[in-house]
Amino acid sequence: MPVSGTAPYDDGNVFARILRGEIPSRRVYEDEFAIAFDDLNPQTPVHVLVIPRGPYVSWADFSARASDAEITGFVRAVGAVARQLGLEEPGYRLLANTGLDAHQEVPHLHVHLFGGRPLGPMIAR
């Protein structure tokens, strides 16, 4: 079910629980600002979720409340994950669903990193 990108943060969401170690995940990267783990239902050969460690619901929330260090650290983490997974040369896609119209499903900011094959056009017309 889609969630609002402007809703208050719910610390019971699945990603908050992963951050606290209450739910297992196959982590492929972590640092002081972010963690990345394999998506449970991959849409491409490589499908990783990158999430900030802080309690942010959406890009709007993150860009308004996160420190400069958190923002920089998160962006750098996304790039580091792509490099670590060998996706820099062949290419990859980043996707962040924010809010109801975009069908955001978890009320914790996250970026999908897709790769491992040619992905084709992003949006069918």
Stretches found by the model and what they are:
Residues 1-125:
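HIT superfamily nucleotide-processing domains
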